[in-house]
Regions:
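Short beta-to-alpha loop/turn elements within the nucleotide-binding domains of ABC transporters
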Residues: 13, 31, 71
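Conserved coupling/switch loop of ABC ATPases
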Residues: 14-23, 44
Length: 143
């Protein structure tokens, strides 16, 4: 008889044990999701910084050839119509100017407000607003 009782006690997990395991799994899933989301935002910031560095190189090459900064980022891809640029040696970028990692255009201004003797080039970051910190921080070529 005692053998039969022991056998019944080992048939499965109790509801409490299952709830504890489920709670632990939910905590782990939440932690992993938060870490992945942070890494995704970090990667977007890194891509925006790399894009800006690449544009800076192309803009500097444009200036070397034409003795002036381009009127827009699109001028890196196609010679501006109506401008007399006998030394234009582009395209200075291989593909069309991409959007920033959040789907908005990079902002370019020559002469710059912050770099008055050259140009400002930046992305407004995740929030699309000037300023911000952390994931919402702007990616700038003057900091």
């Amino acid at each position: 008889m005692s053998l039969n009782r022991t056998h019944r006690a080992r048939r499965g997990f109790t509801l409490l044990e299952l709830l504890v395991v489920m709670f632990i799994l939910v905590l782990l899933a939440g932690t992993v999701t938060a870490l992945v989301m942070k890494r995704t935002e970090d990667a977007k910031h890194a891509r925006a910084k790399a894009d800006i560095a690449s544009f800076e190189t192309a803009i500097d090459l444009y200036k070397l050839d034409n003795q002036a900064y381009p009127p827009s980022l699109e001028a890196l891809r196609a010679k501006p119509s109506g401008d007399e640029l006998p030394n234009w040696n582009g395209p200075y970028v291989k593909k069309a100017v991409p959007a920033d990692p959040w789907g908005r255009a990079y902002l370019y201004q020559a002469p710059g407000e912050h770099n008055q003797d050259s140009y400002d080039l930046f992305s407004l970051g995740k929030d699309g607003q000037e300023g911000g910190a952390g994931n919402d921080a702007d990616i700038l070529n003057w900091d």
